[in-house]
């Protein structure tokens, strides 16, 4: 993976451009994952989109091959927004469609408020707008202290996926990746998110918004996604059935097709 240097360490990203030569100036879709995973979460989206779009993924600061800060690091949404811009600049993406899952989707809403000039559209997936309403976040620090990362990861897997909802191989990869993440990053992101409340600014978002929601997320009831939907004029909402919080992984192809149909509608207007 190529890297981009920032004032706070390197970020690793990957740009896939397999568009055929007759696709002139393909648009870029930038993907931002959430807590306790890496950019591999998007792997099954790529085949659904790469014939027409440049696919830009990266390991969010704190995960994967990107810089892993220590416990003293001061996390902020603005700092993570600057990371997104650094990745987009490195990939030559002046404008891009933004897709984010969980915390990453909240980042999309933040960018829609604070960096709208760079965005073509925003697709938040199982994402909050008010961290204080995210269920179970407040228990993370004590739970990790008592049960360790393995115990925390086991509980998270139950909340991300229905039993048998993903293949054995993908379940093994996800659980292993999640449990090996830095607890400092997980707690830093979780506690940062608790302080985020974008509620009063959602109505100012003018870029097209396509919300993808799981019908059974233990973290985000559909009522929360509906709040976002009702607060952003002309936003769309697609609810994926029989899915928990990890919908972008368990229902990757379905989510990618939902995104593609949304972008196709934008191109026709």
Label every model-predicted segment.
Residues 109-114, 118-148:
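Flexible "cap/lid" loop of the alpha/beta hydrolase fold
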